[in-house]
């Protein structure tokens, strides 16, 4: 805790450091008065105050009554006593690093806390989120330098003897924020009982999300509704995506899913006593998307007028839908004196194609992409190949010289795919 005084037109900046980390900063004229500040820190060797002078003498910075005390700043901690809620944590002038929000259990036996980290944005690497169980063990951490930052992280945490779970957040400026949902239930989601006759239906879908609607069961449960949890479990892996929703809705969108993936979807209702009831399982598949990888490409035959291009079939996990075929792109290299516009051909049911009627001794760029009904995936890296020169035998193909009447020619295709077209 400390007081500071920053008065004058040419005031610059006051900084406070915990070790090498900035924990407080104030810039410019603050009025002819003493201001109070408190910051929660885990002390790293030294606390340093730095006053940076302005460009003139008409500005003074002073500090007074500095104290260091154990504990969390009173204005930087909050107790959450409801069994369901949402937090939208933003930076403000009163925000101090390492602020805490403690979820406390009131009357639910064998309580388990659900924490849904919905969205996080850190302006600096030193921002973070930490979650601790009732014994003080750190269950989860995310720091500002992690790949940002829409999260969909879903935690189930046992309360332990202290009957609380703590969220600790450090934000550094007003571009930083964090959004959470939380709820308390008895036991865990795996203990939910099937509620006969309760169904969910698929309303819409994208390549990464499913939109669901379910029957209103508010009158079915004697102890009322507190919140819903929607789970989408992949049919091909142990990955489960979960979302937390309020009791006044019968619609939800689950995002962060994989394209063209089958999921077992169910809705869990939690009543006022923390008991859970689940709907029948709905099987749903996300929409297709473009392939996420490019095939690896190589050339198997080169003559003076043709190139045979071959590629390894794209592995199934990168299809993101029904793979319709491959697209082969060819063009003269950028340093060609007579550049030719890029041409491409779609190839079906095969992994090779021969490109004919090329110019002898000409360098070409070739690459390949796979495609679904949603479009082309990424292209392979450029494969540079030069056709043979008449009178010289290529190292890995037979010589095939032809007379060319024009520099610009139409490319022809020969492959075992009869429906391919330029």
Swiss-Prot record:
Localization in the cell: Secreted
Ranges of residues in domain Fibronectin type-III: 2-74, 196-286, 291-386
Spans through the membrane: none
Protein name (database record): MAM and fibronectin type III domain-containing protein 1
SMART domains: FN3
Tissue spec: Component of the acid-insoluble and acid-soluble organic matrix of the aragonitic skeleton (at protein level).
Principal cellular location given in the protein's record: secreted
Native source organism of the sequence: Acropora millepora
Presence of the UniProt keyword Repeat in the record: yes
InterPro entries tied to this protein: ConA-like_dom_sf (IPR013320), FN3_dom (IPR003961), FN3_sf (IPR036116), Ig-like_fold (IPR013783), MAM_dom (IPR000998), MAM_domain-containing (IPR051560), Sperma_CUB_dom_sf (IPR035914)
Keywords associated with the record: Repeat, Secreted
Highest taxon listed in the record's lineage: Eukaryota
The MAM domain, residue ranges: 1-75
Gene3D superfamilies: 2.60.120.200, Immunoglobulins
Keyword Oxidoreductase attributed: no
Gene Ontology cellular component annotations, sorted alphabetically: extracellular region; membrane
